[in-house]
């Protein structure tokens, strides 16, 4: 009898010790994750030097709250509303829209990653699609032009091309603008071909656990330790497979353009500017983002390969290289390798407007 009691006490003691260990580790994990959860590069950036820091921190917190649907399209959960960012009932950033296109309306979707979504924009109107909408609102074209922000954080051609064909076509768009390139360059080739291995599986498990238990941080620390604190979704820079990634990019968008033609939908594929592209002299603040990691220096060079193969998109009537968009701008534009603030979004939108306006007038 006493032996059984002893076993029970030992078992109970063992459980208590494990609980204490888990609790201590979770406390450490919570402290470790504070900076991860609340930091945004734009808060201390010259890009927003005239905006109070408390407002920028509020923006940062809102962007961290945005939830994604972890499907093959990397869509955004619908109906998320904050002060600086709003997601409508279809999962697009900005105001509500109808599935059915209104009469006398030229409907445009802008597809891309976080730079299209506007991960540092001070409002929905100050994203690239938002500024583009303002430009068309001021134009006298004899019809309504509707610009819809279909950008999603982390999106690249592997997720975007199916998203265009399977989801956006149902909204009867007249034009779909593809504004990307950076994510395709940076994301590992293994992610492009669905061979992410143990690292990718661990990333997915931690992500799914976070959806179930959003306040439990231990899995994140374990993941970062196992992955040596690398971006496990994007992987590490792999220049050896760059040509293969470029080929996949061409294949995906050329196929999407073919499908669009069959539905009388126009596609306009654009290569985005990032820090280091074009002939612009970067500022001292921006320079720190290039020199802190040797991989960063190679990314803008790699992006040029995507611009070089634009002519190979034979089924895409419209394509453009926007990597020189900021050539004549001396002020700080980027707060990291590819993200810009409101001013950068406005400059990009003005360039896109000049390219798209003739397409609408021709239509």
Cite the ranges covered by each PLM segment.
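Histidine-centered active-site loop/cap adjacent to the catalytic His
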Residues: 11-14, 24, 249, 309-318, ...
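Membrane/wall-proximal cationic-aromatic binding patches
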Residues: 37-122, 126-135, 139-140, 329
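Internal alpha/beta domain cores that form substrate/cofactor-binding pockets in large enzymes
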Residues: 107-109, 135, 144-171, 176-223
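Loop/turn elements at helix/coil->beta-strand transitions in domains of secreted/extracellular proteins
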Residues: 105-106, 141-145, 171-176, 261-268, ...
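Serine-dependent acyl-ester chemistry module
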Residues: 181-309, 327-331
